[in-house]
Amino acid sequence: MKKRMIALALSATMVLSVGVMLAGCSGDPDTNPDPNEKENVSLVLWGPSQQQTMAEEMIEAFKAKYTDKNYSITYNVVSEADAAGTITTDVSAGADVYAFANDQLLVLQRAGALAQVGGSYLEDIRANNSASSVEAATFDGRVYAYPYSDDNGYFLYYDKSKVDSPETLAGILEDCAASGSKFIFDLDNSWYDAAFFFGAGASYEVTYNSDGSVNTVACDFDDATKGTVAGKAMIELANSSAFLNGDDNSITAELTGGTFGAAVSGTWNAKVISETLGENYAACKLPTFEVDGQTYQMGSFAGCKLYGVNPTSDHLADAHRLAAFLSGEEMQQKRYDDMQIGPSNTKVAASDAVKANIALAALADQAQYATAQIAVPGGFWTAVEAFGQEVVAKTVTTENLAEKLKTMADLIRASEN
């Protein structure tokens, strides 16, 4: 009797199993997906407005290369300079992949906004990019970003038919005044204003704790000699009739209006300036400036641009794939061809075309006077910008200069990131 009951139980179990198997083969699309159906993947990419058209072409190239998935990629304009301030407000709501300037790496890493790079992507970064750009993407021995340019600096553009003395700031202003043209300098932009402070010998230094948080910040921008020299030079520039405070839009407007004499900018403007000026197009290192009978060479920032991958992305592997593609050799070549953006990829940088590029040659010449844009105090940007704004507004004078410099330097020294 006991054996018969066991047999009946086994029979019932077998019938139930067969029923389940048959149900599984019923052809229900929800339970039996087509193995050939591609996964739909939506990604958001942030980058600067100047590169939007080019970036959209790159996106199409990415989709054409990777046909194993259906990619939908949206490009939103967020400049490299604004990336950290934007994404750290809510990392989970940020882009899957975003471009940023390398000085923001520590802030982004500490905020949990950067996924670490590993595997073949890491090997490719280290093998094919300049040592300085790899260093800029690295914190505590780990790589957190994909380098895509190594030209984040500035130098002098000028019209040879209007400027005969590009070596000195006084000569440039005199030539521009004589030709009825303008010298364009973004004097209320801290990135450019650093040229005067670095040129005068001023500096800052940040030390960090092991977790990336700030330990100490030192800054001598209010030094009685160094700070005063920089401040006086900025005041003198602002008072020149040939000076025009302006950004990229101002450069374009002066080119269009025929009143462009010279400008301090970077490689992203090389195409429009060279095409407009034609045979009168020229570029060189930044000029010297003179204060109280002493001559100083203008300094600058030097850095690179990177792509970061958001670790909260719903499609993390695909985000890494996109960042690697956008920063690879082929796309760095396209950036150079389309916008003359200087590559971090060593093979592209070694090409004859890049070596012969006038703007990149000027940037290379300025490099000896440049300060690496790494470990910049978080308060530097707003503090120096505010000082520059007051110089432009002519509320900074030689009489209150020491006070204004101290206010600026105190804000820098109070930096928390």
Regions from the language model: what does each represent?
Residues 88-89, 93-96, 124-160, 181-185, ...:
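A structural signal for short loop-to-beta-strand junctions that line the ligand-binding cleft
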Residues 102-154, 165-173, 282-285:
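Hinge/lid segment of periplasmic solute-binding proteins
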